[in-house]
Amino acid sequence: MEAVLRWITAGESHGPALVAILEGMVAGVEVTSEDISAQLARRRLGYGRGARMKFEADKVTMVGGVRHGRTMGGPVAIEVANSEWPKWTTVMSADPVDPAELADLARNAPLTRPRPGHADYSGMLKYNFDDARNVLERASARETAARVAAGTVARNFLRQALGVEVVSHVVAIGTAANTTGVVPTAADLATVDESPVRAFDAAAEAAMIAEIEAAKKDGDTLGGVVEVIVEGLPVGLGSFTSGENRLDSRLAAALMGIQAIKGVEVGDGFETARRRGSQAHDEMRPGPDGVLRSTNRAGGLEGGMTNGEPLRVRAAMKPISTVPRALATVDMTTGEEAVAIHQRSDVCAVPAAGVVAEAMVALVVAQAALEKFGGDSLTETVDNITSYVKRISTRPHVPADSRPQ
């Protein structure tokens, strides 16, 4: 099945700008440049970020698809300018440059020592590059700014069509973890963002900061785990009919597509695999407004479909591969032992990864909602949602006095 909502990004880390194009969004969704800028500012948050975050401005320009603060039904194009572009106009020029002009530029020195864990090595071989610059410019996590921009339109759609919010928090950084099991709601998002590490527990926050400081002192980097939650989704987004239509498989693909993400779990995920069946599933009982669940171990997804419980998905981020204490590698020009190149980088970008994960979850859930409910305008989509919710609420599992009139 061809996706109703599609997105693509373009641009390099030190190019003039990043561009996001979102195709298939209904008309009438309220979104502004300020909305996108606010989400990009959240992406720059986090203890352990590098120097680039201090001057990255992320100037947003809505290039197409939006007029007077509302989508028009056509592709939405968003440009996010790179504030460092003036320093790179020659080195990253799209047009040919005189080699003599490039020869004396330190920024243009070939990068021939690939970083273990990065795209450098495989990218150089696959695309026949002698310079890793051609790989790392696109492989850089700077590209996620464009995804956050597109995700802002999707999260605004979800809020306006379904009344739901997408939130995230950091569960672990290195060995420091939040073990309380308490999950933030939409009302807690501001509190989470106020935490330097976007943790929803004061004790965990202190431990995470200490972990980052220790890694920084040792010239090292850290990874961690983020969790994304979406409350209030109706039953039935996604499908059991094929693997590609299962919402959990689509969420996993979207999250694994984020730079440095190495694992995804839905609900209790791998912990569920260690339980017996009687302790692994969410038992059901009649309630005043329909079915109630005693737990949410499934993370709001059963059989590839939302089940009415909060959607809960986690992503594991590996430590950043640009390690200040450079790792051993091979020089691709000489074939000799070498130490890996070092580009300016973060000690830890896990807090920012949570914001990027929110954007990807918003895009996938919005895609599933548009596939289910259709419509060319927000008004039409909302009418379709209302009709669907009313229909499933007339089933016997909902008491008669709680059914929509």
From Swiss-Prot:
Keyword Cell membrane recorded: no
Biased composition (Basic and acidic residues): 275-286
Enzyme Commission identifier(s): 4.2.3.5
Residues engaged in binding NADP(+): R43, R49
Binding site for FMN: R138, A139, S140, Q259, A260, G303, K318, P319, I320, S321, T322, R344
One cellular component (GO) term of this entry: cytosol
InterPro entries, alphabetized: Chorismate_synth (IPR000453), Chorismate_synth_AroC_sf (IPR035904), Chorismate_synthase_CS (IPR020541)
Molecular-function annotations in GO: chorismate synthase activity; FMN binding
UniProt remark on cofactor binding: Reduced FMN (FMNH(2)).
Cofactor entry: FMNH2
Xref: Pfam families: Chorismate_synt
GO biological process terms, semicolon-separated: amino acid biosynthetic process; aromatic amino acid family biosynthetic process; chorismate biosynthetic process
HAMAP family per record: Chorismate_synth
UniProt subunit comment: Homotetramer.
Function in brief: This reaction introduces a second double bond into the aromatic ring system.
Name of this chain's protein: Chorismate synthase
Protein species of origin: Nocardia farcinica (strain IFM 10152)
Record gene name: aroC
